Amino acid sequence: RRRRRRRGHRGRRGRGGRRSRGRRRRAA
């Protein structure tokens, strides 16, 4: 049984900028 640990999966996906193109989420 392998358990995948999701660590910061939110920041990793929005890093390429492919999903949200017109929106820039840099300054929180």
Swiss-Prot record:
Q: Which Gene Ontology cellular-component terms appear in the entry?
A: nucleosome; nucleus
User: Where does the record say this protein resides?
Assistant: Nucleus; Chromosome
Keyword annotations of the record:
Chromosome, Developmental protein, Differentiation, DNA condensation, DNA-binding, Nucleosome core, Nucleus, Spermatogenesis
Single GO MF descriptor: DNA binding
What's a BP term from Gene Ontology annotated to this protein? spermatogenesis
Q: In which tissues is it expressed?
A: Testis.
Give the region (Disordered) as residue ranges. 1-28
Instruction: Answer whether the UniProt record assigns the keyword Cell inner membrane to this protein.
Output: no
UniProt keyword Electron transport present: no
Q: Which residues are in coiled coils?
A: none
Query: Which purpose does this protein serve, as stated in its record?
Result: Protamines substitute for histones in the chromatin of sperm during the haploid phase of spermatogenesis. They compact sperm DNA into a highly condensed, stable and inactive complex.
What's the protein called, per UniProt? Sperm protamine P4
